[in-house]
Regions:
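A flexible loop/linker signature enriched in serine peptidases of the S9 family
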Residues: 39-42, 59-70, 86-91, 106-143, ...
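Multi-bladed beta-propeller domains
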Residues: 25-42, 74-90, 146-158
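Residue-level detector of Asp-centered blade-edge/turn motifs that repeat once per structural unit
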Residues: 51-52, 98-99
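Boundary at the C-terminal end of the N-terminal hydrophobic targeting segment
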Residues: 18-22
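Bacterial N-terminal signal peptides
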Residues: 5-15
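Hydrophobic beta-strand positions that form the internal "hydrophobic ladder"
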Residues: 53-57, 103-104
Length: 158
């Protein structure tokens, strides 16, 4: 009986290995011209390009007193980067309007306990109790529109 299981295992492993090799080749082909666009901060992620390809909006942890992501906009020609979100609370899901004059993002900065939550997360991190990444639902997430010319934001969900 062991021989039968061994033969079945061997027979199945060959096609699986071939599929893995093919997937790796496809990935290498698609990712052959990658380059890093952001360097500052502890971590960064979830970036989206403007319709004309000149800018990218992304989330990054860069503020010393805030362990949560904030939203940044980078000019891909100059490298100039500006924070779009207010600097406190959690942020996510940013988007550049196709017209290029406004952006939108979700934020909890209106949460009365936003700064307290930041302090608690920093304390956990200092104690080595940092949580693994997970996307936590937060009832204080609202959607904001930010005008790139006036530098003003407005809450769209309240």
């Amino acid at each position: 009986m062991r021989t039968v299981y061994l033969l079945i295992s061997l027979a199945l492993s060959v096609p699986v290995a071939a599929l893995a090799d093919e997937a790796a080749e496809n990935e290498a082909r698609l990712l052959s011209s990658t380059r890093q666009l952001t360097f500052a901060g502890k971590r960064a992620g979830e970036g989206y390009f403007s319709a004309d390809g000149s800018k990218m909006i992304f989330q990054s942890e860069r503020e010393k007193d805030n362990p949560f992501f904030q939203i940044y906009l980078i000019d891909l020609e100059t490298g100039d980067t500006e924070r779009i979100s207010p600097g406190h609370g959690k942020t996510t899901c940013a988007w550049i309007h196709p017209g290029g004059k406004k952006v939108m993002f979700a934020s909890t900065h209106s949460d009365p306990d936003a700064r307290k939550k930041q302090e608690e997360a920093l304390k956990r991190r200092a104690e080595g109790k940092e949580k693994r990444y997970s996307w936590d639902y937060d009832a204080f997430f609202d959607i904001y529109e930010y005008d790139l010319e006036t530098k003003k934001s407005r809450n769209l969900t309240r």
